[in-house]
Curated annotation (Swiss-Prot):
InterPro entries in UniProt: aa-tRNA-synt_IIb, aa-tRNA-synth_II, aa-tRNA-synth_II/BPL/LPL, Anticodon-bd, Anticodon-bd_dom_sf, Pro-tRNA-ligase_IIa, Pro-tRNA-synth_IIa_bac-type, Pro-tRNA-Synthase_IIa_type1
Name of the protein: Proline--tRNA ligase
Lineage: Bacteria, Bacillati, Bacillota, Bacilli, Lactobacillales
Primary localization class, coarse: cytoplasm
Swiss-Prot/TrEMBL domain comment: Consists of three domains: the N-terminal catalytic domain, the editing domain and the C-terminal anticodon-binding domain.
Gene3D superfamilies associated with the record: Anticodon-binding domain, Bira Bifunctional Protein, Domain 2, YbaK/aminoacyl-tRNA synthetase-associated domain
GO molecular function term, any single one: aminoacyl-tRNA deacylase activity
Catalytic activity, reaction form: tRNA(Pro) + L-proline + ATP = L-prolyl-tRNA(Pro) + AMP + diphosphate
Gene Ontology, cellular component aspect: cytosol
Top class in the EC scheme: ligase
Keywords (A to Z) from UniProt: Aminoacyl-tRNA synthetase, ATP-binding, Cytoplasm, Ligase, Nucleotide-binding, Protein biosynthesis
Underlying gene: proS
Subunit structure: Homodimer.
Keyword Metal-binding annotated: no
Organism of origin: Streptococcus pyogenes serotype M49 (strain NZ131)
Length: 618
């Protein structure tokens, strides 16, 4: 492919509105352009990468018997009313009317559509299982689109749905998908973890998220690629190294989610779902009597603890939530933080939000800062974190402004439902007892759910089982964020390329180091002087030879300065660069391996053989 024929609008500078490196490089390297807020055009390079990823997916899904189809993006609202999600999905749902004033939506996901198609066509367990998927644009009216392709209003997604006559059959397909996802992301060159996830708006029960890890840019050996003009990092002057570190740190670490994972086992979970090892403790101290004490101007746990000279771990944090229009009191040990996802899941609530100051006063008779679990109205629902039951003679709010109660003992002074509703902390023991928890940022690239009968129940999708009984179809759901794969790969494979000029100056610039499976082309073939006929002829021969051996070749045939050509090549990030330069008449070309910065000169006749050796090594 001739570069002069492609739309690759590279920029000399990073875009000023980009906060994460993947967004900046996709724009600067000419992969994407923003058409409107949260809406992007995928230019030829991006489209080629996405198509390569689609090929990987299709190959792996064929192995597990998944069949591709295509559903409409424009959906009737009636289907979503059947499932109940038309009213509950929220403001992210694009709603519109046609000329007949009928309600439609732009699909953010397609559970209802696939359920309806199968409901109308499948009547017996003998017709199951079915394993269907599509690759299609989705739509979500994000309030604040950001970070390039990571949070957009239109995005490309692979969504799959499986249909079964029982849960045992679903378990088999779920495991097939889990293994297929691992194979897909491994082939794509991603550093990822499969973690325990939250079913969220999909209504799933068991679920697993696949997160592309976005580590901090502190490891110079990982993020910096040295040109052959620099022997090692030790040769770079200290002041230049400090500049490089500052440049690496200047870009925000992307990833919407925090992952908690064990240092010594396979345990990994989204922070929203992560738990830690818990060991109940026996009470050894005698229980004191309740005593009300004045705590003037103390509104926070640390202020109360300091005023009463107690540790924060001896205090009870009392919070009030409204769950599906019902008040729920949540209790934590004072130095812990609430995990609202755990609380919402435990309550099986559709809606959960913190109560207002006015609602707190109506319920407790006091404002925030003085709330507590003692002497609440009969029938009040109290959900306490499991650590609270270990407390003896704790401090809690007195439900009276400016006062607290000491000597509070769970069981004696209040009754509660005990469950894990706290946010874990880094360094705590893993729940399996092996290793401690560490945190990392991650980009969600895939998610699989066991939906069960959530949609078949609400939409009447039933079959006759082997005993002739009418039973709901059991479902699974499997998603991959196709467009955000591009962002995730660039986040992990962006590199700062450093070289030394003949004058001894050090220069550095960002570029992409694409893994071979997803690179838009395999080889960047550059002619230094397009007016040199010998070089042109050699380039044409090499292009033909490479293509005959199955290489995708991008040939830079532009009449541009060689510096511009090399800069664009570093930005675009193809794995191999072959330069036809001053030694073209001698039949000598230069090969450069992007991942390492290594380069060698070879006879053009030996190019293919040399590339085969080098690509095996790297």
């Amino acid at each position: 492919m001739k570069q002069s024929k492609l739309l690759i609008p590279t920029l000399r500078e990073m875009p000023s509105d980009a906060q994460v490196i993947s967004h900046a490089l996709m724009v600067r390297a000419g992969y994407v352009r923003q058409v409107s807020a949260g809406i992007y055009a995928y230019l030829p390079l991006a489209n080629r990468t996405i198509e390569k990823f689609k090929t990987i997916m299709r190959e792996e899904f064929e192995k597990i018997g998944a069949v591709e189809m295509l559903a409409p993006a424009l959906l009737t609202a009636d289907l979503w009313r059947e499932s109940g999600r038309y009213e509950t999905y929220g403001e992210d749902l694009y709603k519109l009317k046609n000329r007949d004033n009928s309600d439609f939506i732009l699909g953010p996901t397609h559970e209802e559509t696939f359920t309806t198609l199968v409901r109308d066509a499948v009547k017996s367990y003998k017709q199951l299982p079915l394993n269907l998927y599509q690759i299609q644009s989705k739509y979500r009216d994000e309030k604040r689109p950001r970070n390039g392709l990571l949070r957009t209003r239109e995005f490309i997604m692979k969504d799959g749905y499986s249909f079964h006559h029982n849960y045992e059959d679903l378990d088999v397909t779920y495991e097939d998908y889990r293994q297929a996802y691992e194979a897909i992301f491994t082939r794509a060159g991603l550093d990822f973890k499969g973690i325990i996830g939250d079913g969220g708006a999909m209504g799933g029960k068991d679920s697993q998220e696949f997160m592309a890890i976005t580590p901090a840019r502190t490891d110079l050996d990982r993020w910096v690629v040295l040109d052959k003009s620099i022997a090692s990092m030790d040769d770079i002057p200290k002041e230049v190294l400090e500049e490089i570190k500052a440049e690496l740190a200047a870009w925000m670490i992307s990833g919407e989610d925090t992952i908690a994972y064990s240092t010594e086992s396979s345990y990994a979970a989204n922070l929203e779902m992560a738990t830690n090892e818990y060991k109940p403790s026996s009470k050894v101290a005698a229980e004191d009597a309740l005593a009300e004490v004045e705590t003037p101007h103390c509104k926070t746990i640390d202020e109360v603890a300091a005023f009463l000279s107690v540790d924060e771990t001896q205090t009870i944090k009392t919070l009030l939530f409204v769950a599906d229009n019902e008040p729920v009191v949540a209790l934590l040990v004072g130095n812990d933080h609430i995990n609202t996802v755990k609380l919402k899941n435990y309550l099986a609530a559709d809606f959960l939000e913190p109560a207002s100051e006015e609602e707190a006063r109506a319920f407790f008779g006091a404002g925030f800062g003085s709330l507590g679990p003692v002497n609440l109205a009969q029938g009040s629902r109290i959900v306490a974190d499991r650590k609270v039951q270990n407390l003896t003679n704790a401090v809690a709010g007195a439900n009276k402004d400016g006062f607290h109660v000491t000597g509070v003992n769970p069981g004696r002074d209040f009754q509660a439902e005990y469950v894990d509703i706290r946010e874990v902390k880094e360094g705590e023991m893993s729940p399996d007892g092996h290793g401690v928890l560490q945190f990392a940022r991650g980009i969600e690239v895939g998610h699989i759910f066991k939906l069960g009968t959530r949609y078949s129940d609400s939409m009447g999708a039933t079959i006759l089982d082997e005993n002739g009984r009418t039973v709901p179809i059991v479902m699974g759901c499997y998603g991959i964020g196709v467009s955000r794969i591009l962002s995730a790969v660039i986040e992990q494979h962006a590199r700062l390329f450093v070289n030394k000029t003949p004058k001894g100056d050090y220069r550095y610039a960002w570029g992409i180091n694409f893994p071979k499976e997803l690179a838009p082309f395999d080889v960047h073939l550059i002619t230094v002087n397009v007016k040199d006929q010998v070089a042109q002829d050699l380039t044409a021969k090499l292009e033909a030879d490479l293509m005959a051996k199955g290489y995708d070749v991008l040939t830079d045939d532009r009449n541009e300065r060689v510096g511009s050509k090399f800069s664009d090549s570093d930005l675009i990030g193809l794995p191999i660069r072959v330069t036809v330069g001053k030694k073209a008449a001698e039949g000598i070309v230069e090969i450069k391996i992007k991942a390492t910065g290594d380069s060698i000169e070879v006879n053009a006749e030996n190019l293919i053989e040399t590339l085969e050796i080098l690509t095996k090594e790297h």
